[in-house]
Amino acid sequence: MKRIVLFSMFVVIIASAVRVHGGDCPRFRGPAGDGRFSETGLLKEWPDGGPKLAWSVKGLGKGFCSPTVAGGTVYVTGMDDQDQGYLFAFGLDGSPKWKTNYGPEMGKNGPAKPGTRGTATIDGDLIFIMSSFGRLVMVEAAKGEVLKSIDLLERFGAEQAKFGFAECVLVDGGKVICTPGGPDASLAALDKNTGETIWQTRGLSQPSGYCSARLIRRGSQRLVLTMLEKALVAIDPDTGKLLW
């Protein structure tokens, strides 16, 4: 059974940071996806007996994702016994806000451990989830309404990832960048509001590599970096052109 556990130090830091809009963690490994956080004054060692438990939540089902935090809300996914994926929303005190079903996830009959994979990406009033079956789901953050659900395998002619798609999609301005892994579509960018395809990586057809893309700068140049099945690649985020 999946459980969220947050310790009092973590909750206090996050709660105070949200008030100054500096402590949100809207995607996997922090705001920039690099594992860096702006909080200061953290304890250098635990007190005797460990940190005090602030709250915990049971009944989330199975999953391998990380929680994300934005605007005073914690979001996390889990899969129930019917192999259905759910997105849960909690306050910073653990109080439930809502949960919503967003479709099937890889269950016990799949080739890998059952459960959700992708960590939710939060962008303002929208949340984006990549399911283990390659479906990009857009959810409204306030009440959990599913706005769109796009089958990326069907759209880009991609094959199912053996162990389930596992990525936290990248939002860049008005684009959602993901890795369908189809012919001429190792990566693709979709309009974050309409779901229409903006670009795909022509000439690059490697399958997805269970990796979350990062946006970096090298001088004045912006690059999207990610791992595919057999290569580390750099993509122009504006055009989808393979740079190296």
Which role fits each region the language model picked out?
Residues M1-L6:
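Positively charged n-region of N-terminal signal peptides that target proteins for export
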Residues F7-S16:
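Bacterial N-terminal signal peptides
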Residues V18-W244:
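Noncatalytic, solvent-exposed loop/strand surfaces
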